[in-house]
Amino acid sequence: TFIFLLSTSNFLKSRYGSQFFKPIISVFQTKNELNKEYVFKNNVYIRLYQSGFEVFKKYPVFGVGNKNYRIETCSGEINSKYFCSTHPHQIFFEFLAEHGLAGSMILFFILFNLIFSKIKTILNSNNYLQLGCLIFLVTSFIPFLPSGAFFADYNLTIFWINLSIMYSVGKKTNVYTSN
């Protein structure tokens, strides 16, 4: 669905194609090391991802804490490896930087278990509302796709609303009516 929308929508083409995919593809197509370095230094998303990874390397086990990424990257002693922002704009780097390996493994286990434990039931139910919620939840975790801060009020609210609707509208997935 996303690939279809990306290929038909001019807005999505310019948003994701020119800002994210095109620079990455150009890195692999060029043999010139200076051009690769230029792309990596001037692409905002790549710099944000690198910054998130650097924060994770500094605090690998427990991370910097929830919503503390900005404090680490925007403090007075700005490290040249960091790109000052509120979050790294990618869910995996955000979880690793803020919660480390321990917290990320726990969060991903819980979230993936909630989302994927009922996937077979949802796909067989022909319930389009459940399927739409499932697609939204799965696309929230597409690797290297820029995203908003997961723990920001808006993003987390939309995520939990979709998860709640996915579970509540089906007879076999509703915890109050399932056997």
Describe every region a protein language model picked out.
Residues 51, 91, 95-98, 114, ...:
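Generic recognition of well-ordered alpha-helical segments
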Residues 62-65, 105, 151-154:
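Short, hydrophobic secondary-structure boundary micro-motifs
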